Amino acid sequence: MCKVLDNSLYRKDRKRYKKISECVTGFNAIYNKNNIIQDDIFNVLENYVTRHDMPFELLRYPIGDTELCACTFIRQGRMFVMVNSAIPLSKQIFAAAHELYHIYCYFEEKDFVLMQSGSILESDVIDDEAKELEDMEANAFAALLLAPRDRLEEQSAVYNLSYKNVSVQDVLKIMDIFAVPYKAAVLRLFEEEKIDIKTAKKLLQTGNDEICKQIEVTGKAERWQEIPREIIRFGSLSEKMYELEQWEGVREERLESDKARLKEIVEKLRKPAR
């Protein structure tokens, strides 16, 4: 688990980390203001792309391979972001924020790698294996966006959080407030110098079973560990089908057949994997 520290931009390149922090501050000033984003990240993402005059499609559905968290690609002038809804909600949120950084680079820094080859986010990159600089930057951007310094200070005061003897339950409280994964919460506390490196390493050595047990016992951050199988979205497909229905643009038999097929697909995806 300590690879999270070793592979963090904060440890690898402090100067670049500060630059990313400035980017997040600028982004929030325009697209988010003072809100704690949580699961509104999907709306923030959509708003950002559409305000740059590019059609946007958000795809959220369960994929059997939970190692694949998200991907982004551009086809025929339209941007697609797919988020795997078979992973915990906090990880979906972080994945969306991670992908937002790649999109940010495309629009603000004219980095056209996204157009050429797209972006694929695997679970290990979020957890502890971010080896490429851009992935380290994207992880830093995501964590800073979801748990910005000012809001972290504010909420620490609201909940009277003390960081002198930080426990796993204190980290769970940060997770609950900001909807971030455990490792990201620990890293943010370390980055803001709420905890030292020794404490960070100790917290990161806590096993996943123990973390899950404490979430279950306390109820803290439990809502963000859920896998909401009812959330299935195929971009603007449903809206376009509705428009066709209103305009009578296709034969009724064809439309009913397509609607039945879509319903069948959705119901199949909502069934728990065996």
Language-model-detected regions and their locations in the chain:
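Active-site hotspot residues in diverse enzymes, especially metal/ion-binding acidic/histidine motifs
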Residues: 1-274
